[in-house]
UniProtKB/Swiss-Prot annotation:
The organism of origin for this protein: Rattus norvegicus
Top-level EC class as recorded in UniProt: oxidoreductase
Highest taxon above the source species: Eukaryota
Protein name per UniProt: Tryptophan 5-hydroxylase 2
Presence of keyword Iron: yes
Similarity-based family: Belongs to the biopterin-dependent aromatic amino acid hydroxylase family.
Length: 485
């Protein structure tokens, strides 16, 4: 039987303003006596009573008691009397009655002992739940007041289908507003995106001659500017997309090919989307290294202009940089910072996203270069942003988040960073100002989000870090041996 483990956090109690806080030193002393001799006492008593401890298993109970001095000690003495080994204890203010607190006890015992314990607890406490999952408070009740966000990658299906404006809902000033053929084509792309679910291959599209021609014009004209206007990371990946994904003037690349390429390069994938998503839903995708991507092509009457993101914007603007590991991490961290954040904070993050990943500039070899997708997919604004006419400011999330985002005209200001790494570090510092009662961790093995708000959840992450550090140390030792250091 393992020694009992007690977790009392003075910060935890103080945060809730419980009167029980004043009793913690006294009760802690008593409880210390309970737990110090617990393993030995349990073993000896089990031997005398002839109970079989080999059938012990882990279980849990949540009970509610009045917020008064001595109440917790009286309840926990019952665990000792029934030889129930306490592994972990947490507490919080009761959501049912403000005058009570709820106690979560993770314990180890036999079925008989547990049933006897519950019968005794019922006389002193109110049983809330028995044998709950390990995450009963952190994943369910503790997140009741937090805006919903996907906890696993498959839940992005829910985000992707909450489209604010569908591709068929064109404004009167849209080039394709009066083109019924174009509108029907857009409806087809909506149906494809709305029917897609996580884990499926992205449906391949047979683009029309008109759509391929429009793509070709955009591809050809932008390709002339990239050598002098795009950042080096973009220029490094663009030829690879030509080689592996069919980036050519006479061919519109397929999202499935692009997604597989990105997965190998940076861990990102793309999935089709029917239209505009809310900032919260779009950023949630980035947290999982998933980029929501349109498949429709802009109207052919004006190939060099589009009032909305289309596949030319996605494939030529975003994809080449999503293949860069550092840029991919920068994008993901913005997404992670948005999970569970308030509407106000999400809007600030979305604005920072807009002026970096969409319209960001960086310095390379003493020259301004574009890395924002909105610039790299717009001939006119790409030229303007790197000209003397543009207003360029240093990127600072605290001030950038207040800048107005313009959709139909050039931006009033553009923001420059020395590197992706600098922009990422500034965003990390900015993310610390976001009010959120927990931190999040992306588990790449299960492709899920873990909530970090107690010692147990943090310990799991630390174990992963230790494993990574051991690998690094082993590699360094072998290098030193090889170099004779």
């Amino acid at each position: 039987m393992q020694p009992a483990m007690m977790m009392f956090s003075s910060k935890y109690w103080a945060r809730r303003g419980l009167s029980l806080d004043s009793a913690v030193p006294e009760e802690h002393q008593i409880l210390g006596g309970l737990t110090q001799n617990k393993a030995t006492a349990s073993k000896s008593e089990d031997k005398r009573s002839g109970k079989d401890t080999s059938e012990s298993s882990k279980t849990a109970v949540v009970f509610s008691l009045k917020n008064e001095v001595g109440g917790l000690v009286r309840a926990l003495r019952l665990f000792q009397e029934k030889h129930v080994n306490m592994l972990h204890i947490e507490s919080r203010r009761s959501r049912r009655r403000s005058s009570e607190v709820e106690i979560f006890v993770d314990c180890e015992c036999g079925k008989t002992e547990f049933n006897e314990l519950i019968q005794l607890l019922k006389f002193q406490t109110t049983i809330v739940t028995l044998n709950p999952p390990d995450n009963i408070w952190t994943e369910e009740e503790e997140l009741e007041d937090v805006p919903w966000f996907p906890r696993k990658i498959s839940e992005l299906d829910r985000c992707s289908h909450r489209v604010l404006m569908y591709g068929t809902e064109l404004d009167a000033d849209h080039p394709g507003f009066k083109d019924n053929v174009y509108r029907q084509r857009r409806k087809y792309f909506v149906d494809v995106a709305m029917g897609y679910k996580y884990g499926q291959p992205i449906p391949r599209v047979e683009y029309t001659e008109e759509e391929t021609k429009t793509w070709g014009v955009v591809f050809r004209e932008l390709s002339k500017l990239y050598p002098t206007h795009a950042c080096r990371e973009y220029l490094k990946n663009f030829p690879l997309l030509t080689k592996y994904c069919g980036y050519r003037e006479d061919n519109v690349p397929q999202l499935e090919d692009v997604s597989m390429f990105l997965k190998e390069r940076s861990g990102f994938t793309v999935r089709p989307v029917a239209g505009y998503l809310s900032p919260r839903d779009f950023l949630a995708g980035l947290a999982y290294r998933v980029f929501h991507c349109t498949q429709y092509v802009r109207h052919g009457s004006d190939p060099l202009y589009t009032p909305e993101p289309d596949t030319c914007h996605e494939l030529l603007g975003h994809v080449p940089l999503l293949a860069d590991p550092k840029f991919a991490q920068f994008s993901q961290e913005i997404g992670l910072a948005s999970l569970g954040a308030s509407d106000e904070d999400v809007q600030k993050l979305a604005t920072c996203y807009f002026f970096t990943i969409e319209f960001g500039l960086c310095k390379q070899e003493g020259q301004l270069r574009a890395y924002g997708a909105g610039l790299l997919s717009s001939i006119g604004e790409l030229k303007h942003a790197l000209s003397d006419k543009a207003c360029v400011k240093a990127f600072d999330p605290k001030t950038t988040c207040l800048q107005e985002c313009l959709i139909t005209t050039f931006q009033d200001a553009y923001f420059v960073s020395e590197s992706f790494e600098e922009a990422k570090e500034k965003m990390r510092d900015f993310a610390k100002s976001i009010t959120r009662p927990f931190s999040v961790y992306f588990n790449p093995y299960t492709q899920s989000i873990e909530i970090l708000k107690d010692t147990r959840s943090i310990e799991n992450v630390v174990q992963d870090l230790r494993s990574d550090l051991n690998t690094v140390c082993d590699a360094l030792n072998k290098m030193n041996q090889y170099l004779g250091i």
